[in-house]
Swiss-Prot record:
This is Arabinose import ATP-binding protein AraG 2. It is found in: Cell inner membrane. The complex is composed of two ATP-binding proteins (AraG), two transmembrane proteins (AraH) and a solute-binding protein (AraF). It is an enzyme of class 7 (translocase). Pfam families: ABC_tran (PF00005).
Length: 515
């Protein structure tokens, strides 16, 4: 569906979103305080009709609190909120929705057991004589799905949909309520590349209709691709608003978010490399088009860069024993090793921090201490019969302090932590195992810039201690800023290697692009 047909289908919705002169949404001097914390400090922000306005900042910068003010969850102690020229004060989320503001949160607010149609019309189900009018319900749901370009059966329960499809249902709910302002909170964090492309298409269509879009993200590439303007928050304050994203220097944007220069974020520290620690010789397997060979030395951070489908994650799984190679082998400290499982790799000194941290790296409902001790327990209780609770608590506390993991204590569910602190717990798990080779697959994805700097510092400490870090990253600035040298993969094979002195975005992209 094109933007034109989507706009035409929306009819009066687009008209309803047309403001008088000035911004569609304006916040002036908004202040929100909690016991001992000023979450928002006299924040002012304006969002125009027909624009995508990005919000960036580290965790705790105030972005989520701002969304909660817009949605009526949090009541400001000072300041005014104006919508379409009229001052508003929302006592509830329902009041905000009725006024025309919808929030698409990271954790989607759908009822899994209800159908697509029922979720789309939740709270406003059409009825006759107190009975749901199924025909009208289905017709309205189909209309909403058509406007989104989604071919989904409105009669199936939402629990059978993908994350991307569920997100489209959330957007459909906002359209059904004629929302003029739609805010997205980290919307691509769980989406595939195809689903992200679909989401961006919809957001551009909503912008073309004259709606005001607020887009909260940690991902700078998304800001440059999608946003017209961007506002940066730090420590509850609005630091700056940039009116032309296309002309915005990336280093300046990072500096605004963290209050320091990009050099300080990556903080690269050179060090001498030692002997070869790990070597792949003719390694072949699923996702690799030809045998792969490379070496990594003690004290090195070796970056692996490539586009989606280049085979980097598949190579990491072969090194980690998660997938058995069809040919070739791995050598560790000059000795040939073969792993029947990841457990064998860990015992040999190789660990993987997987790309999908939430699904493969942590047990979200378990505590920080339990997640940290998953592998170390075999040292406490070789027979695996009894758990040593005291030693586990002591180990957890040791690494909470050593890695500055922001958590109340080791009993806190890891799912309650930020992405950066979850990643620190995964790293701590392997530090407790005396690992020599750290395979880091997209380790900072979805993590704010400040937490990234802390993780990079951990990498440098590991390398300085004679360990090897293999960093798989799709972030050009990251892989150039942190790595000692960079291996570029393309279409399941190694396309080349670039020394740090010659590592530029153009050099890496030229090697990574398909033939």
């Amino acid at each position: 569906m094109t933007m034109q047909t989507m706009t035409a289908a929306s009819g009066h919705d687009a008209e309803a979103g047309t403001p008088p002169d000035g911004p569609l949404l304006a916040l002036d001097g908004i202040t929100v305080t909690f016991p001992g914390v000023r979450a928002l400090d006299a924040v002012s922000l304006s969002v125009r009709a027909g624009e995508v306005h990005g919000l960036m900042g580290e965790n705790g910068a105030g972005k989520s609190t701002l969304l909660k003010v817009l949605s009526g969850v949090n009541q400001p102690q000072a300041g005014t909120l104006t919508l379409n020229g009229t001052a508003q004060r929302f006592a509830s989320t329902r009041a905000a929705l009725e006024a025309g503001i919808a929030i698409i949160y990271q954790e989607l607010h759908l009822v899994p057991e209800l159908t697509v149609a029922e979720n789309l019309m939740l709270g406003q189900l059409p009825s006759r004589l107190g009975v749901v009018d199924e025909r009208t319900l289905a017709a309205r749901a189909l209309d909403a799905l058509e406007r989104l370009g989604e071919h989904i059966d409105p009669g199936i329960p939402v629990k059978y949909l993908s994350i991307g499809q569920r997100q489209m249902i959330e957007i459909g709910k906002a359209l059904m309520r004629h929302a003029r302002v739609i805010a997205f909170d980290e919307p691509t964090s769980s989406l595939s590349a195809r689903e992200t492309t679909q989401l961006f298409r919809i957001i551009r269509a909503l912008r073309a209709e004259g709606r005001a879009i607020i887009y909260v993200t940690h991902r700078m590439e998304e800001v440059y691709e999608l946003c017209d303007r961007v506002t940066v928050f730090r420590d509850g304050r609005r630091i700056d608003t940039f009116d032309s994203v296309a002309d915005l220097d990336r280093d300046r944007l990072i500096g605004c978010m963290v209050g320091r220069s990009i050099e300080d974020v990556y903080g690269y520290r050179s060090r001498p490399a030692g002997d070869v620690l790990i070597e792949a010789k003719g390694l072949a397997g699923p996702g690799l088009a030809e045998p792969v060979s490379f070496t990594a030395r003690r004290g090195e951070i070796v970056g692996f860069f490539g586009l989606v489908g280049a085979g980097r994650s598949e190579l990491m799984k072969l090194l980690y024993g998660a997938v058995r190679p069809s040919a070739g082998h791995v050598e560790l400290n000059g000795k040939r090793v073969a792993f029947g499982s990841p457990r064998d790799a860990v015992r040999a000194g190789i660990a993987l921090c997987p790309e999908d941290r939430k699904q493969e790296g942590i047990v979200a409902i378990a505590s920080v201490a339990d997640n940290l001790n998953i592998s170390a327990r075999r040292h406490f209780s070789p027979a695996r019969v009894l758990l040593d609770g005291r030693r586990e608590r002591e180990l957890a506390q040791k690494y909470i302090e050593r890695l500055a993991i922001k958590t109340r204590d080791g009993d806190t569910p890891i799912g309650a932590l930020s992405g950066g602190n979850q990643q620190k717990v995964v790293l701590a798990r392997w530090l407790a195992e005396r690992i020599d080779v750290f395979l880091m697959d997209e380790p900072t994805r979805g993590i704010d810039v400040g937490a990234r700097a802390e993780i990079y510092n951990l990498f440098y400490e590991l390398a300085e201690a004679g360990r090897t870090v293999i960093l798989v990253s799709s972030d050009l600035a990251e892989v150039i800023g942190v790595s000692d040298r960079i291996v570029v993969m393309k279409e399941g094979r190694i396309a080349g290697e670039v020394a740090k002195a010659h590592a530029t975005p153009d050099a890496l992209i030229k090697l990574a692009l398909p033939r």
